[in-house]
Amino acid sequence: MSRRCCLSPLGPDAELPVGTRNVFARPYPTRMGQLGPLFSCVPSMQNFPRQVNAGENQDLYFATQLAFDALVDAGLRPHSPTPIKGSVRIGYAPPFNASTVNWLQHTAFLDQTMDIIRRFFPRSPEESLDEVRKKLVESLPAPNASSFLLGTGYRFASWIARECSFAGVATTMDAGILSGAAALQNAVADLVSGQADVALAGALTPPIPRAYLEGLSGAIPFSTRTELYPFAQEQEGTIPGEGGAFFVLKRRTDALRDHDRVYALVRSIAIGHNPEDDPSAILAQATEGSEIPVKTVGLIEADGSGIAVAEQREIDAVHRLWGEHRPGGPLVAMGSVKGNIGHTLRAAMAAGVVKASLSLFNRVLPPQIPPEHPHDSLANLASSAYLLGEARPWITGDSSSPRRAAVLGANFDATDPVGAAAKGGRSAVIVLEEEPEVRS
């Protein structure tokens, strides 16, 4: 609510050395939304199999802590003595983690290094080369078969399920920026089908190293500015961020029976795979699928990436559905949490769901960090959409209509129709609604 910007200068693991350019000679971010000390866990709450070393996938313990915190907030106990009929769905797929990198260093990278040394020193005795290899191995974290498996996707999800005493399906998936929506969609399906009575859905973007940032910079327009203002008139690119979120889901009847605190209802989720579909088509699909008039949505937690062409698509989509504003007509508030924490990549839609759910629960329209010069299409009286520069009470004109919010997300390929045709999912919408029992 304080419109705080949490972007900070890159740390030593992400910054470029002075005087160097990134691999693609493209703009490289100078700031990022970083987890810092938040990337932590409470060891006593988790069954560590051994002492953790630098060669293990420590993302796992952070994700498990997030899952624990979500369960506790929902009134459930991690390490329940009786198995829970529950499922775990996680959006998580960094190109590498500490575990996989350590194994590459012990194998392929070590072989390449020794090959280079042999080429530069062809007359070196084999005993000396063996000693060099031994010293290189000693400088690395000790390899461990269990830690290697925990660096893979299937063990990642099953570990969390075991720690939470969930006896059902546990999967890790990668839908890019839409991973949060995909995880939530699968979790809802688990509940509807009866496969689970409780579902954990989450998405995670762990600390981003330089190698990952350099790779992303080849395809994503990054901004070199120190702040990100979604829907500003002049945009040059996005600023990355780290983060994660987990949600505990139940069928509404079960949640009310158990007297749970309900932050929001998931009314509909739509993920578009057709390159011809623009955000308005996906938003219409999401609202029509749950028989919700689109103009009853009062808040759009937008993608708002800072990429000009992507933001223009979102604005056009909203104007296409809401039309030109007329006196007494419905208005829809727009904002994006990316101005506060950056673009958290696979966790971006999960971050949007957190913000929108809390907005519904507290009946407050939350502000975003306001741009000095808002986009012309939003800063005029003819627009049915407006940017939230200040927090305001969420007042509805119709006492019989519940408050509703839509969370939008788009993969970076959404602005490239040719490339998008070969990819699985371009944009997504999650429609949330306040719980009527809370409202009354």
Give the residues covered by each predicted segment:
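Condensing-enzyme catalytic core of the thiolase-fold
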Residues: M1-S440
